[in-house]
Amino acid sequence: MNRGFLCLASTAILLCQTFHPDFAETHTNLISRVAIGNANQGSPDAAEGKTEGINYYVDCRVGETDGDGRSPLKPWNTLDAVNARSFLPGDAIYLKRGTECHGILWPKGSGSPTAAIHLSAYGQGARPKVIAGKNDEEAFKLFDQEYWDVDSIEFSGGTIFGVFVSGQTGILHHIHVRNLLVHDVHGGEVKNKESGLVVISPGKLGQRFDDVLVDGVTAYETNQWSGILVGGGNFGEVPEQDWCSHVIVRNSAVHDLYGDGIILFRVKDGLIDTSAAWHTGMQPTQSIGTPNAIWTWMCTDCVVSRSEAFLTDSPGVDGGAFDIDWGNTRNSVLESYAHDTQGYCIAVFGAGYVTRDSLVKGNLCINNARSPRMARYQGAIFLWTWNNGVIENLGVEKNTVYWTPPGSFPAILNRADIRGSQNDFRENHIYSGSPLVLDSNNKMSFQDNRYTTCGNDGSTWIFGGRTYKTFEEYRSGAGQEHGSTWKTEKVAARCQGGQRPQEAKSISGIQATKIAGDTGRATLPGWTVISEIPASMDTAGLFDPAAAGQLMILKNLYTQFRASGLRLRITLSLRHPNSPESLGNAIRDLDLSGIKVSSPLDHESPSLTKTRLVAPDGTTVREWHEFLGPAEIGLAVRSVLGEPLYSLMELEAQ
């Protein structure tokens, strides 16, 4: 959070019950667009009336040739040949897999609404690598260009950016980047937030982007600011008509960053879905702001859904997971998972502007605010306004919080000027290891909540500036918590994130069950997640968004629990046959090292994902028959294996 620039953070999600008619209609439209209209977004074969262009090939392993680049037998052998050409709609540039090219890649030209330019890979093996020179500002660049599909390349190096897309002229359309690996951007002192690994940002006031897709991108290691940033622009006041629009970031992961993880700034109609961020806010000394993992700022109709943040930090304040920041309208954080953070789980802020129609629903918070400094002033759910800011209409609903702070600090901290007709904190489950459960002004209404305090007999509640020593005293004296309950548990571990409440449904809407198992069941080497995922592949050789999202969630789970002995087995049930080469490349690009993946040709494809958590003796302990979000599977595995062994996770990642 840069208080001088009034910049904090924000977020949103899918499948929401809403409390405001306009809000409900807008988010229903967004969800419908994401689920149906964008099922093929980013696929080169999705465009109708595609203009036929020329295919060009690049093989940097080949020595000097007189190749014209128009066949794999006569490829270009340097990036200079690519950078010198202005490509036309329908053209395609293919870099050979398993090769390295050195220098910046900046192909010129633009596609058209019916024929994007395609930059991709050919052959078999690892993604082709583009390695920036030590003085290059970026590894890949587009500037004042539009209608580009870029996929299946590894970019490394750059002093300011890994991937940088910008411009100075009007509206630039259709920038789709998919299946990229971007890493090791190291330069001098970080100057602004429009820097880092993947940055798609206007270069001038009045310039913006429309139709941006960042899909299946893994980005890590930078001493610049951002993991993935879309929007922004350091221009002061920017009218809403000049904000970027129709932006999707999905199935992506960022980690080991000086600043923010995944952020949307000045965006209309934005989505961050099935993505993850960790080791954010690693800057040693604060210089330009205080980061969070995943958030939005100055965003209208933006959603953060089914995403995960952990091991977040900050050189100052914030250091949280998710945040609906000031200047946002109709933003949501839904069905997401925040755990083991230095700062808060979820915040909603207002400063200088009105933050309107915010929804925080169905999220899971475990082991947040590990910093005593941050725990004291933030809590797990943090509502705050300053500089005459206002929050208008806010719903905090059906979230589960496991709160074990390093001191007697409240799980819920509300210091916000909240106005409007519907400002409800309801149907939440709060497990607090602190006797001080809640500290709120009287601007919020509390009802139908379930509170549990652990390890002590009493509880303390602060509401409207008055302190209450029992729950009944608080409920009667404050006139709050109609339909709510409170109980105490002697065992402190009950508040550490063991299980969801028995009466609650799972986040994804179906209660998983314990299954007895057969007497002849096979034993396993350890706790195992077995998942059968229906999938399809496009002509670029990439998995469909739903399958890619489930794979990303399971991969992130395995990254955390591999050192604890977790096994992961995945069966990909392809709806249509694909070449072994394409399938092999797609699996290799996912970097599923240590994960058993199979794709039998004669396997009947299920219509829904099926996932099981299986004990070492072969007993199926939990089973799900639909897309499985990070919170549900994360909690289930954590309940049997405990907190991830993060120190060993670091060693295995090296």
Q: Where are the model-predicted features located?
A:
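Acidic Gly/Asp/Thr-rich repetitive segments characteristic of extracellular carbohydrate-active
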Residues: 40-44, 48, 60-96, 100-101, ...
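Acidic, glycine- and Ser/Thr-rich low-complexity intrinsically disordered tracts
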Residues: 27-49, 118, 197, 418-511, ...
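Right-handed parallel beta-helix
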Residues: 116, 123-125, 146-157, 171-186, ...
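Structural microenvironment flanking redox-active thiols in thiol-disulfide oxidoreductases
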Residues: 537-593, 598-601
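Glycine-rich repeat segments that build the extracellular carbohydrate-interaction surface of secreted
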Residues: 56-61, 76-101, 116-123, 149-155, ...
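Right-handed parallel beta-helix/beta-spiral solenoid domain characteristic of secreted/periplasmic
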Residues: 94-97, 112-161, 181-190, 216, ...
